Structure formats: C-alpha cells, structure tokens
C-alpha cells in the first residue's frame, strides 16, 4: 500500500519550490559565497561562458527541433523554453539551465558533464539512458518526467531538493552522489547502485530496495519495516542505523 497518496505529491513539490525561492531571497552575499564553495567541492565545475558566435555547435539548445551527436559547451539559459526539442547522443559540458522549460523535450543517450540544472520544468520530458556527471541538480521534480525509458544515472553529482516520488529507477546509479533533501517515497529501486553516496535528510519510505548496493554509502535512514530490503547490501558502521527502528541502543 502506498505510504503517501499520489495526489499529495504536487503539494509537496510546490512547498519545496517555495522554500527554495524564499531561501534564495534571504541569502546574504556571504551565504551565497559559502554555497558556491560547497558546490565547487562536489562538482569542480568549469566556468560558464557565453558560446562563441563562430562555433557551429555553440548554438542555444532548442533552436533546432532535432539534434544528434552534437556537443554543447558553456551555454547558459535562464527562464527560456526548449519545448518539444529532441536530443540524441548529445553531450552538454559546463552548461547551466536555470528555470528552463524542458516540457516534452526528449533526451536519449545524452551526457551532462559539469552542468547545473535549477528548478527546471520537465513535464513529459523523456530521460532515456541519460548520464549526469559532476553536475548539480536543484529543485527538479522527476515525478513529472515521462515514464517511457526513464533511466537517469548520476555520478559525482549533487541533488538538492529533488523529488523522485513513485518513480521506477531499477538498475540505475547514484554513485558518489550527495542526495540532500531528496525524496524517494514509493519508488522502485531494485538493483540500484548507491555506493559511496551521501544521504542528507533524504526520504526513503515505501520503496523496493531489493538487491541495491549501499556499501560505503553514508547518512541514510531506512526503516526495514517500511521498505523491501531482500538482497540489498550494506556496510558497517552505517548499517547499525537499522537498530533504532527496532528499539535497540548500541553503547
């Protein structure tokens, strides 16, 4: 039985977005500098620059209906729409997508390296065999993405305030990735590789985690009675966190 009703999910995500926007308005210059320094430790991102006018590949993504085997570098988009664009086997390096509308956009066999995606709209977006490497994703509601071929992999990334409510992520990867305030409620997470990842206030409830790899992962809080764990692999000392759910104290 679902832990949370499906209809409650949009309210949850709206609350997250409002909180992110409020936090951004309240940040002092010193706080913003610290956040940038924290992110750089995880991402080691390249400096974003505007594309050169004379580079044929350096065009704004979305200006073409279909792009295949193209490389996009250091492109910055803010509050623009890439509606219905199709990208196949493309690589995005050092790009920033801030509040970009990716509704019904299709990404197939694409790779994002040192990229930043902030509060992007992904209603009906196809994310099929897409790899995110050393990238930061903030306030992304993956529940809105198309279920067709949904298969994102994350390596050395930072996911902050993202939602994977009721998503199917079987056999996907979250390797050496920081999962901060990220919700996995009611997800299918069989045989997922979480090795080396850091959980910070991440919600894992009502999930199927059978066969998943949590070895060398840290910070997770998983209730064995509220999740399926058959065949999942854990390592000490983090696995000792299960004891609190059965009323056992280790001194």
Region roles according to the model:
Residues 5-9, 26, 30-33, 44:
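Intrinsically disordered, low-complexity repeat/linker tracts enriched for polar/charged residues
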